[in-house]
């Protein structure tokens, strides 16, 4: 029997307000993949959660598509594979489910195609496919990361930031919000003065995080001009959640990725009460505390 590739891939939250398409943080919600060769004539899928059961099992499957794309790039052929999947990352909720699947697909192609990619090369590939590093970088490395993708040179640069000493709360609506729909809400252009203002806010926010000044960082996270003003109307619960967070003296309330999940940076002494208040008052969502993931994707080979 063939060896089994086991992958544990974290979720991620992107933007942190003003860090649009650049800043991301890994979270302890996971996509679990167990992959082995099959004697069948096509790829097989075994889904262990209800959300994953909605995914296609033909060649339009995202993991299949990306894995074959990577294999083609390196001129290798992949065997037919059986993928067992279990995920507690909700789909189309702004928690990086597609980035987790993308990273998983690259690892699958790397192992079964014997490509021998370094982690740096995994990052470059993932960002080239995704178009920006805000989700894939923390998914690969863990922690809080700022990154930039040069679409001319096809080079990704990343910098790690200290893990914030805060409690993180995610408020997850029951409905999906596709990234494509959320991006359609954005303006095509910003004026020079608008771009300078948002860039200055983002720069200062990063420095505040690096200095562990969460009061200032949180204040600046909520002054975004790149995307939040254009997306908040798509999330009916945003204003109510932010009001409750303010009542509990939270540092910041922002959209997680493209939404609709709402991310809160909470003071540790207030986080439990805040989560309970959110769950009792905002009944159309589920709120929970989630740890910041520091390890990134984990790979394990089970020899059979």
Curated annotation (Swiss-Prot):
<keyword id="KW-0067">ATP-binding</keyword>
<dbReference type="InterPro" id="IPR036554">
    <property type="entry name" value="GHMP_kinase_C_sf"/>
</dbReference>
<dbReference type="GO" id="GO:0009088">
    <property type="term" value="P:threonine biosynthetic process"/>
</dbReference>
<keyword id="KW-0808">Transferase</keyword>
<dbReference type="InterPro" id="IPR000870">
    <property type="entry name" value="Homoserine_kinase"/>
</dbReference>
<dbReference type="Pfam" id="PF00288">
    <property type="entry name" value="GHMP_kinases_N"/>
</dbReference>
<comment type="function">
    <text>Catalyzes the ATP-dependent phosphorylation of L-homoserine to L-homoserine phosphate.</text>
</comment>
<dbReference type="GO" id="GO:0004413">
    <property type="term" value="F:homoserine kinase activity"/>
</dbReference>
<dbReference type="InterPro" id="IPR006204">
    <property type="entry name" value="GHMP_kinase_N_dom"/>
</dbReference>
<dbReference type="InterPro" id="IPR014721">
    <property type="entry name" value="Ribsml_uS5_D2-typ_fold_subgr"/>
</dbReference>
<dbReference type="InterPro" id="IPR006203">
    <property type="entry name" value="GHMP_knse_ATP-bd_CS"/>
</dbReference>
<comment type="similarity">
    <text>Belongs to the GHMP kinase family. Homoserine kinase subfamily.</text>
</comment>
<dbReference type="GO" id="GO:0005737">
    <property type="term" value="C:cytoplasm"/>
</dbReference>
<dbReference type="GO" id="GO:0005524">
    <property type="term" value="F:ATP binding"/>
</dbReference>
<dbReference type="InterPro" id="IPR020568">
    <property type="entry name" value="Ribosomal_Su5_D2-typ_SF"/>
</dbReference>
<dbReference type="InterPro" id="IPR013750">
    <property type="entry name" value="GHMP_kinase_C_dom"/>
</dbReference>
<feature type="binding site">
    <location>
        <begin position="90"/>
        <end position="100"/>
    </location>
    <ligand>
        <name>ATP</name>
    </ligand>
</feature>
<keyword id="KW-0418">Kinase</keyword>
<protein>
    <recommendedName>
        <fullName>Homoserine kinase</fullName>
        <ecNumber>2.7.1.39</ecNumber>
    </recommendedName>
</protein>
<keyword id="KW-0028">Amino-acid biosynthesis</keyword>
<keyword id="KW-0791">Threonine biosynthesis</keyword>
<keyword id="KW-0547">Nucleotide-binding</keyword>
<dbReference type="Pfam" id="PF08544">
    <property type="entry name" value="GHMP_kinases_C"/>
</dbReference>
<keyword id="KW-0963">Cytoplasm</keyword>
<comment type="pathway">
    <text>Amino-acid biosynthesis; L-threonine biosynthesis; L-threonine from L-aspartate: step 4/5.</text>
</comment>
């Amino acid at each position: 029997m063939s060896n089994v590739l086991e992958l544990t891939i974290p979720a991620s939250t992107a933007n942190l307000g003003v860090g649009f398409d650049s800043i991301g943080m890994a979270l302890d919600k996971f996509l679990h993949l167990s992959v082995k060769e099959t004697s069948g004539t096509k790829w097989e899928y075994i889904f262990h959660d209800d959300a994953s059961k909605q995914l296609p099992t033909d060649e339009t499957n995202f993991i299949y598509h990306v894995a074959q794309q990577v294999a083609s790039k390196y001129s290798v052929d992949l065997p037919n594979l059986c993928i067992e999947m279990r995920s507690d990352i909700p789909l189309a909720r702004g928690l990086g489910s597609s980035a987790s699947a993308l990273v998983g697909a690259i690892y699958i192609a790397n192992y079964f195609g014997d490509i021998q990619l370094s982690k740096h090369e995994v990052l470059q590939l993932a960002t080239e496919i995704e178009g920006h590093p805000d989700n894939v970088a923390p998914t690969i490395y863990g922690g809080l990361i700022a990154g930039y993708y040069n679409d001319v040179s096809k080079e990704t640069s990343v910098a790690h930031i200290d893990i914030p000493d805060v409690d993180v709360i995610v408020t997850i609506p029951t409905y999906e919000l596709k990234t494509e729909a959320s991006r359609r809400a954005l303006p095509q252009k910003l004026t020079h003065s608008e771009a300078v203002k948002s860039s200055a806010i983002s720069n200062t926010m990063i420095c505040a995080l690096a200095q562990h000044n969460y009061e200032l960082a949180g204040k600046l996270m909520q002054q975004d001009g790149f995307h939040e003003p254009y997306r908040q109307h798509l999330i009916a619960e945003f204003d109510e959640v932010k009001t409750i967070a303010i009542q509990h003296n939270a540092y910041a309330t922002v959209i997680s990725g493209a939404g609709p999940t709402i991310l809160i940076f909470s003071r540790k002494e207030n986080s439990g009460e805040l989560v309970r208040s959110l769950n009792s008052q905002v009944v159309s969502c589920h709120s929970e505390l989630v740890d910041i993931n520091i390890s990134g994707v984990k790979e394990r080979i089970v020899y059979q």
